[in-house]
Amino acid sequence: MTHQTHAYHMVNPSPWPLTGALSALLMTSGLTMWFHYNSTILLMLGLTTNMLTMYQWWRDIIRESTFQGHHTPTVQKGLRYGMILFIISEVLFFTGFFWAFYHSSLAPTPELGGCWPPTGIHPLNPLEVPLLNTSVLLASGVSITWAHHSLMEGDRNHMLQALFITIALGIYFTLLQASEYYEAPFTISDGVYGSTFFVATGFHGLHVIIGSTFLIVCFFRQLKFHFTSSHHFGFEAAAWYWHFVDVVWLFLYVSIYWWGS
């Protein structure tokens, strides 16, 4: 870095991509072991190594950006493009689930009784917990925008308050979704309705947990004065991701809960 004459970040060799890949392998293998052999040892090992990798990789990035100043405006521009492309890939990921749902529901086969929901399936009432979940996520979208505007204006206390409210709403959403799953009158093995419902809403729930983790990291970073009104891409990326999760839920609610029931 001593004689560098450009604005790009020359990254040092890092073990975290390798440990992250290995922990992902352990987690997926552990899930298979849990499903088929009722053993959670490999899954717990995978989750532990994944959490350790996340912590150490995040720590290194914070060190490089906040304390060493490697994240120049040029580097931040590249990171913005990267986050946008990542969110586009996630949109395509969820498009596959919506495709599966509409493929099955718009032309139900005789095996399903020629109707949707299939014969024998009692769908959830869209005006009960799902509607509450929708209002919770919409409220969290408002509070994350409040946090972002407070940060832009240099209002640290309001930013922390708004971010805390967003995290609390995200956790509340996850708890509501868990209770809904627990009380649902159908399971993932109840044909195409159960599988499309639980895979689509389950992956969305996973994204809410990931987004909440992202926001919790931002909360602790803000407590340590890591963000300024002009240098806060970590928070901006988390806010974009949260808005994406919000919009996907609206499509899920309208398609699967409301129209699909």
UniProtKB/Swiss-Prot annotation:
GO MF annotation terms: cytochrome-c oxidase activity
Mitochondrial intermembrane face residues: 35-40, 106-128, 184-190, 257-261
EC top class named in words: translocase
EC number: 7.1.1.9
Subcellular location: Mitochondrion inner membrane
Main location: mitochondrion
Membrane-traversing stretches: 16-34, 41-66, 73-105, 129-152, 156-183, 191-223, 233-256
Pfam family, one: COX3
PROSITE patterns cross-referenced by the UniProt entry: COX3
Keywords (A to Z) from UniProt: Membrane, Mitochondrion, Mitochondrion inner membrane, Translocase, Transmembrane, Transmembrane helix
Membrane topology label: Multi-pass membrane protein
Source organism, top-level taxon: Eukaryota
Positions on the Mitochondrial matrix side per record topology: 1-15, 67-72, 153-155, 224-232
Keyword Cell division: no
Reactions listed under catalytic activity: 4 Fe(II)-[cytochrome c] + O2 + 8 H(+)(in) = 4 Fe(III)-[cytochrome c] + 2 H2O + 4 H(+)(out)
InterPro entries recorded: Cyt_c/ubiquinol_Oxase_su3 (IPR024791), Cyt_c_oxase_su3_dom (IPR033945), Cyt_c_oxidase-like_su3 (IPR000298), Cyt_c_oxidase_su3-like_sf (IPR035973), Cyt_c_oxidase_su3_a-hlx (IPR013833)
Similarity comment: family membership: Belongs to the cytochrome c oxidase subunit 3 family.
Function: Component of the cytochrome c oxidase, the last enzyme in the mitochondrial electron transport chain which drives oxidative phosphorylation. The respiratory chain contains 3 multisubunit complexes succinate dehydrogenase (complex II, CII), ubiquinol-cytochrome c oxidoreductase (cytochrome b-c1 complex, complex III, CIII) and cytochrome c oxidase (complex IV, CIV), that cooperate to transfer electrons derived from NADH and succinate to molecular oxygen, creating an electrochemical gradient over the inner membrane that drives transmembrane transport and the ATP synthase.
Name of the protein: Cytochrome c oxidase subunit 3
Organism from which the protein derives: Tragelaphus imberbis
Upper classification of the organism: Eukaryota, Metazoa, Chordata, Craniata, Vertebrata
Gene transcribed to yield this protein: MT-CO3
